């Protein structure tokens, strides 16, 4: 065979163990000539490119079939279609009428989608996007182009979000994409249920689908309260049609795992429970459970007394904005597992002295100071998209405020508006997408720390602009009565203290009283209404960020009265000891906001 003037002899070698058996295609060849074996990696690619060119609308050469879908006609070669698609192979090699037809109509696939898939058969290239994936996947399934189907599944897996995961789960179930179905279900139930339960997709679920979610032992919720709230919200979304399903849903709410106060104040007072005898029985079961001594509760064994065992997602610590030494936009995260800091998307504008919280899967940066003005704007970070967006602004400008999440509301507490300290408090309702005032505190407080324990919001210390004094007083807000009341004072005055909650107790770390910057730490126990001292921090800190994770309390950055700090230390209550983490932030930050978020997968 003559190719480009060269005589090529092909030999095939079959190796088995240590023996080599040689066969030759040329009977006249002898063992002295080793021959040449070659394989072209571009040969098939070139062949398919040429065939694709031959079928183009301008040429239509050697085509032997015309595929028709709606108004779209696609010339093609049977042998190419059959070699890549089992669907076409069965069509053209069997006894079907299409095997001899020049025109073949393809039903259940729109023309443009069919064109994309035929283009893929010839080119091995296809673009999957949000706009086409829902038509591309079922069409690829029909033509049995399994590589394309898998690419569509992989794409949808990367798009999973609390707002769409239930829809993707239903789509995967419809098209028998078992791996994607499992991934979407795990995402919704085992990773992000608290965020999913407030979305529109959850409210549109069927009874069977809701039961499937809330019955899972691996459901990821901070407390069983979230499951009860999700169930009540789903019923009330279409009360007339869904009220009859209340007992069925209550089977899967583990009421005995709720606190006694929550059972009495919330569950027992819920009208849906009061008016349903079967649901009352579940409440009585929970009350009996709590009446037993702790060492006897294991004697009651039902599905509702079994604790859930959620899969723990890796967490990262997010430090938002701050002063370094002026207001900055940068945001960095600390990976606890890898002991490293890394940058994520910057804030849209410079922001320090803001309130930062995590709510429903997003991080909120509330108010603050942009370097020239106190602001009332609010930016929201979506970790899955690594993007910031804006929501409606607060009604008042606030910097050095406290921010916390209680129930379904985000509270902005006190602060400084540029001329005076504030006692006012407002709350953001994400469902209504609006801010509203609630009862004001009894004292003006800027540089205030806040925390939530057992359904109550606490405002700790701060600075009273009227008396020009740092404060030791603490106030407690009851959202049911919409009232603030004083609780026990701290042992020392603290403005700019880092406030956090760990194991149901409120910590106040550092802060200052006039020029004196503190490293002392005290802890408030709401059950006894008392404060106690714990071990001092390693460094004096004020205006530091605080967060709690894995039974440890972290204090991040701040300043010592002369310079900003880049170090982070954590408190272990079991050892009553503070320790520094090995790696500092990229630069010193005071007045930064801190939150713990799920590590983006």
UniProtKB/Swiss-Prot annotation:
GO terms for cellular component: Cul3-RING ubiquitin ligase complex; cytoplasm; cytoskeleton; cytosol
InterPro entries tied to this protein: BACK (IPR011705), BTB-kelch_protein (IPR017096), BTB/POZ_dom (IPR000210), Gal_Oxase/kelch_b-propeller (IPR011043), Kelch-typ_b-propeller (IPR015915), Kelch_1 (IPR006652), KLHL3_BACK (IPR030578), SKP1/BTB/POZ_sf (IPR011333)
Residue stretches making up the BTB domain: 63-130
PROSITE patterns: BTB (PS50097)
Chief localisation class: cytoplasm
Gene Ontology BP annotations: distal tubule morphogenesis; monoatomic ion homeostasis; proteasome-mediated ubiquitin-dependent protein catabolic process; protein K48-linked ubiquitination; protein ubiquitination; renal sodium ion absorption; ubiquitin-dependent protein catabolic process
Entry annotated with the keyword Repeat: yes
Keyword Repeat appears in the UniProt entry: yes
Kelch repeats by residue range: 316-361, 362-408, 410-455, 456-504, 505-551, 553-599
Entry-linked SUPFAM superfamilies: Galactose oxidase, central domain (SSF50965), POZ domain (SSF54695)
Pathway where it operates: Protein modification; protein ubiquitination
Molecular function GO labels: actin binding; ubiquitin-like ligase-substrate adaptor activity
Subcellular location: Cytoplasm, Cytoskeleton; Cytoplasm, Cytosol
Sorted UniProt keywords: Actin-binding, Cytoplasm, Cytoskeleton, Kelch repeat, Repeat, Ubl conjugation pathway
Superkingdom, natural source: Eukaryota
Record-annotated BACK domain positions: 165-268
Subunit structure: Component of the BCR(KLHL3) E3 ubiquitin ligase complex, at least composed of cul3 and klhl3 and rbx1.
Function: Substrate-specific adapter of a BCR (BTB-CUL3-RBX1) E3 ubiquitin ligase complex that acts as a regulator of ion transport in the distal nephron. The BCR(KLHL3) complex acts by mediating ubiquitination and degradation of WNK1 and WNK4, two activators of Na-Cl cotransporter SLC12A3/NCC in distal convoluted tubule cells of kidney, thereby regulating NaCl reabsorption.
Family indicated by similarity: Belongs to the KLHL3 family.
Protein name as annotated: Kelch-like protein 3
Organism: Danio rerio (Zebrafish)
